[in-house]
Amino acid sequence: MTDLANQYARCQEIGGKVARLLARRSELAQTQFSQRLADATGRLVESDKPASASPAWATALDPWAGYRYAVDVAERSVLFWDTLRQRGNGFVEQARNGLRPVLHFGHELVIDGRKLARPVNYALVRLLPPDGVVIDVSKRPYVIIDPRAGHGPGIGGFKDDSQAGVALKAGHSVYFVIFFRDPEPGQTLLDVCAAEAQFVKKVCELHPDSPKPAIVGNCQGGWAAMMLASSDPDHTGPLVINGAPMSYWSGAWSEGEGDNPMRYSGGMLGGTWLASLTADLGNGKFDGAHLVQNFENLNPANSLWDKYYHLFDNADIEPPRFLDFERWWGGYYLMNREEIEWITRNLFVGNTLWSGEVRGLNGTAFDLREIKSPIILFASLGDNITPPQQAFNWVADIYGSTEEIKARGQVIVGLVHQSIGHLGIFVSGKVAKKEHQQIASVLEAIEAFPPGLYGMEIAERRGEDGETAYDVSFREYRLEEIAARLNRFERSDEQPFEAVKRVSELNQRAYELFLQPWVRMWSNETTANLQRQFHPLRAQRWALSDLNPWLAWLGPAAEAVRAKRHAEVHEETPLREFEHYGSEMFSASLDFYRAMRDAMTESAFFSFYGNLYTVERGEEAQARPAAAAGDPRDLPYVRDALASMTEGGYTEALARAACLLARRGEPLPLARLALRHELAKDYAAYLPQLPGDQWRRVRGEQEIIVRYEPEQALATLPHLLADPQDREKLLELAEKLLDDKRVQEAGPTAAQLSMLDKIRSSLPLERTPAVRTVGAMHEVPEAPAARVAPDLKEAS
C-alpha cells in the first residue's frame, strides 16, 4: 500500500512539473509571436515615415504605383512557378538517369563497394582538385563520410566553400564515401562498416608516406566514422564528427524553450515498429523520403512558406541557388529493412551505440574507448536535430572520469557554434571558411596534445590586409565540469526513455507476430514503387514539371518575362513593404504553431512515459541523487597510476617533467602549438620515438601522478632516471632549450622557474651542465605528429 501511495505521489509530482513546463513553453511561444508581430509592424510604420512631402500610404494608393506593383507580382509569379517547374524537371531527369552525388568537384572511382565480397551500395571516390589547386601527396589525406539519412551524398563537397573545398585548397588529397540509391540485397549496417574500413585501408595504401587519414563524419556519417575507428583504430587518423547524435536520449534545456523535439518522435510513435512497417510496405526497402519529411516537419515555417517566399521575393537572382540546393534535398535514397531497423533499435530508441553492446561482423564490440586517434566534436546551440548534449554526452557515458580519459591516452576536443542550424554545420559557406578551415589547420597540433578534454575557441579579428582573420586557442576542461554544465537536470529527463525502449520492444514483437506476415504477403515491388512515386515530397516535384501538360505555357512565358523584365519594379515600394509584412505575419504564425506543437508533444511524452517509468521502477524512479564526492584516489585508473610511480625510464621521466612544468588553467593559443611543432623537429634526437597513442597513454598516466601526488612525483623522478646517461640527456635537453631564442621569447612563469630548479636539484650529476637562472624547459617540444613523441606539454 505504501508503494502504491508513493507511486501516486510521484505521478502527481510529474504531472505538476509537466503542467508548469507546458505553461512556460506556451508563454514563451506567445511572447515570441507577439514580439515578431510587433517588430514587423514597427518596420512597416518606420517605412511609412515620409522622406518627401508625400507619405508612403499616399504613394501606395497611387494608381500608377499599384499598376507597377501588379506587373511586378505577375512577373515574379511567372518566374517563381517556372523555377518550381525547373526543379521538377531536374527531379524527373535524376530519377531517369539515376541519382548521383551532388559533388561540386570532379571525381574518379577508387573502390566500388558493390563488387566487394560482401557487396554494399557504397563507393570510394577521389576528388579532383579545381584549376589552380596543387595537391601535396605527402600531406594527410581526408576521407569524408556524408549522412545516409534520406538524402544522397555530396553535401560535404557541395560547393567551393565546403569541407572538401577547404581541404583541397590546403593541398590535401580528399576522398569521399558516396552511396547509390538502391541498397544491395541483404546489405546491413555492419557490412557498410566493414566496407568503409576497406576504403580507409586503401587510402592508407595510396599514401604510404603520409600521416593516417583524417575521417570527417557528418550527422549519421559521424557515428559511422566512430564505428569505423573503433573497429579499426590502427588505420584511422583524427576524427572530425559534425552534428552526430551519439547520445540520442539526451536533450538541450534552454530556459523555457524546447530545443530537441526529434528525440521524442520514437516514443510518440510507439517505438521501432513503424520503421519496420514502412520497410515492409516498401517490399523490404525503407524510403528515405520519410526521413526527409521528418526534417521538413521540424520547421513548417521554412518548409511551407519561408523558402518559397524568399524565392518569390528574389525571383531574379535566387533560382540558381534554390535549384542547386533542391537538387540534393530532393534526391531520396533507400535503405534495406535490416538497416533502418538496426538504426532505430540501436540508436534512436535503444541508444546502445556507446554502451559496447553493439558488435561487428567478427563479434567484437564497438568500444569507443578503443579509438586511438584524437576526436573533434563539432555541434551547435542552434541545432534542434542534434543539440550539443547528443553530440557530447556519450563521452561522460563511456568514460567514468577525467582520469580515465587521460589514462587511456584519449584526446577529445569540443567546438560549439552559437547559432547555426543542423544543415548549416555541413552546408554553410561561412562555417566552412571559419570552423572547418580552422579545424583542418590544427589537426596535426591536436594529434600531439597530451590526453584530456579540450575546448576549441575561434576568435575573429581584422587582419593587416583588412580581411577577416581567426585566432584559435584551446583550453583544457574536466569531464565532470562539462557534463554538469551541459545537463541542467543531471540527465534525469533521460529516464523515461528507458520506458520508451521497453514499450518499443513490446510493440515490435507484437507487430512481428500479428501484422508483419499480412503486410509482407500483400506487398510487392509494384505497390512499393507506387507508394514511393506518390509520396508527397516526390509528387510535388514531378507534378510541377514538363510531365504536366497544363504547364506547357510556363517555360515560354518565363523566357518572355526574363527578356523584358521591368527593372524599375525591383525597388522597395510601400506595397512591397506590405507584402513583406504579410509574409512575416504568416511565418510567425507557423512558428507559433510549431512551438505549441512541440510543447504539447513534449508534455504528452513526459506525462505518459514519465509515469510509466515511475510505475515500472518504483523507488528507483526517484530523481537521481548527486554522486557522492568520494576520494578520487580510489578510482581504479588513479590507483594504478600512483602504484606505478617509480616504474619506467626516460620516456616516463620526460612526460612527468612536462606535467610538472605545465601551465595550469591558461588557454593554449595556436602560436604556442606551432612553436612546439618547430621545436620537436629541431630536438627530435632527445624525444622518444613512439606512436602517438602510446605516448598519450604515458603522458596521461604521468599527469594523474602529478595531479594527485605532486611532491612524490618530483621526489621519485630520479627513480625513472637511474641511468646517468638518461639523466644527462634530460638535463642537456633543458640546457639547449634555455639557449633557444624562440623559447626565451615565450617567457616562463615564476612557478615554472621554481619547478625547474627543483627538477635540477633532484637530478644531481657528477658532471653537471652549467646551471642557469633562466628556466625554459617549459618549452620542451612535441615530437613530430607522425611519430608523436612528447613535448613537456602546455609548459609553453
Give the positions of each predicted feature:
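Alpha/beta-hydrolase-fold enzymes
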Residues: 2-82, 205, 209, 226-341, ...
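Short, surface-exposed "cap/lid" segments of acyl-processing enzymes
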Residues: 95-183
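Conserved acidic catalytic loop of the alpha/beta-hydrolase fold
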Residues: 182-187, 194-213
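Gly/Ala-rich beta-loop-alpha elbow adjacent to hydrolase catalytic centers
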Residues: 216-225
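A catalytic-pocket lid/entrance helix-loop region that shapes and gates access to the active site
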Residues: 232-299, 404-406, 410-414, 423-443, ...
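Short beta-strand/loop motif that positions the catalytic acidic residue
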Residues: 371, 377-379, 383
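Conserved alpha/beta-hydrolase "acid-adjacent" motif
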Residues: 385-390
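Small-residue-enriched hydrophobic alpha-helices in membranes
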Residues: 616-796
